[in-house]
């Protein structure tokens, strides 16, 4: 998974963060784009984030000591062979890794929750929230169409576009 997604550092934290940023639920979708929301949903989310905070705080070296191995310590300081991600664009991968480090350093559940809400507001959640471009994949044998994110896209600014001056002006105005 680390190779496919381009993760590095504490892989346990990367994995937990990956779960959090991809799980579309009532709280994450409510916070998407708008940020903090009011209501009892925060109590449920705080409860769930307290469990995740405990998982982030768990010392994996305890497992190594109990099992007499060094496997867990290897995933606590992982260096990826290739920084490129096959499944995420670099911008998304970097944001997930940054969030992973922030969550690992969070002092309490409130800070943990604030970091997650900020991420949901800034980048969204799940496949449709995290990616910029998509393609339709027609599955003839199953008889349906699937939406698949395009992961290898360049970050383009308006200044990069040649022509389209009238359209660019309308966008800016």
Give the role of each language-model region.
Residues 2, 123-124, 161:
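Alpha-helical interaction segments
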Residues 81-147:
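Interdomain "pre-motor" coupling segment immediately N-terminal to P-loop NTPase/helicase cores
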Residues 1-100:
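Intrinsically disordered, low-complexity N-terminal extensions of AAA+/P-loop NTPases
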Residues 103, 146-169:
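Dynamic helix-loop-helix/coil hinge segments at AAA+ ATPase domain boundaries and subdomain interfaces
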Residues 173:
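Conserved helix-loop functional segments at active or binding sites
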């Amino acid at each position: 998974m680390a190779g496919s997604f381009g993760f590095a550092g504490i892989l346990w934290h990367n994995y937990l963060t990956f779960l959090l940023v991809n799980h579309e639920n009532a709280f994450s979708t409510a916070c998407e784009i708008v940020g903090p929301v009011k209501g009892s949903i925060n109590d449920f989310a705080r409860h769930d984030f307290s469990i995740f905070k405990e998982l982030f705080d768990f010392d994996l070296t305890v497992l190594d000591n109990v099992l007499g191995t060094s496997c867990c310590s290897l995933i606590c300081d992982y260096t990826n062979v290739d920084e490129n991600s096959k499944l995420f664009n670099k911008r998304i991968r970097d944001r997930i890794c940054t969030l992973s480090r922030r969550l690992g350093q969070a002092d309490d559940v409130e800070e943990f929750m604030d970091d997650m809400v900020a991420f949901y507001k800034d980048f969204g959640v799940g496949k449709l929230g995290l990616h910029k471009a998509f393609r339709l994949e027609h599955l003839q044998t199953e008889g349906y169409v699937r939406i698949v994110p395009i992961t290898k896209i360049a970050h383009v600014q308006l200044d990069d576009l040649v022509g389209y001056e009238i359209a660019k002006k309308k966008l800016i105005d």
